[in-house]
Amino acid sequence: MGILDGNPKDQPMHYGEITAIWAFMGANNGLISGYEAFVNHAEDTDLISLLEEAIKTMKAENKDFGKVLKANGITPPPALPERPKANAEDIPAGARFMDPEISGAISINVGQGLVSCSMAMGQCLREDVAAMFAKCHMEKVAFGAKLLSLNKSKGWIFPPPLHLQ
């Protein structure tokens, strides 16, 4: 029997897995804070709902990954303080992010998250950690589909030149 036999949760994590989890959680912490600010700026109720869904999902991901790190004697990255609620009308127009800008930023983040989850899955030796990243990947795929639908319905998509012939 080798060191990587048996229950994956009893196997040691390698530095790539640890770094992938730690970086993923750190990125989520930054996105949670940014999305809380976006909630304060957004006016579209559908967009606000998606932002709140993303925040909830990322907090759950961090909770699950934090348990894995702690079980392996590693301190998770620190979370940022929660942002207070504000009304979009109280933010000056020149300082406020517009809904299409917010949606565009989230779209970029979803794409980046898909790549980071895929990369992490590919370097994992522990099946349980790979499965956690696969779950996050699937959640991002589903979220991205909802966001794409919202972007199309609101007219927030700016496509490249379309081939119409």
Task: List PLM regions with ranges.
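Detector for Asparagine
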Residues: 7, 28-29, 40, 62, ...
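Generic alpha-helix signal with a bias toward terminal, lower-confidence helices
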Residues: 36-37, 59, 77, 81, ...
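Alpha-helical scaffold segments that form or flank carboxylate-/histidine-based iron centers
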Residues: 13-21, 45-63, 102, 127-141
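Acidic/histidine-rich alpha-helical segments that form the ligand environment
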Residues: 17-40, 88-135
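Conserved alpha-helical segments that form or flank metal/cofactor-binding pockets of metalloenzymes
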Residues: 45-81, 143-154
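Carboxylate-rich helix-loop segments that flank metal/cofactor sites and access channels
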Residues: 2-4, 67-104, 108, 163-165
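A generic hydrophobic-segment detector
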Residues: 115-162
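Leu/Val/Ala/Ile-rich N-terminal alpha-helices, chiefly Sec-type signal peptides and the beginnings
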Residues: 1-25, 29, 42-45
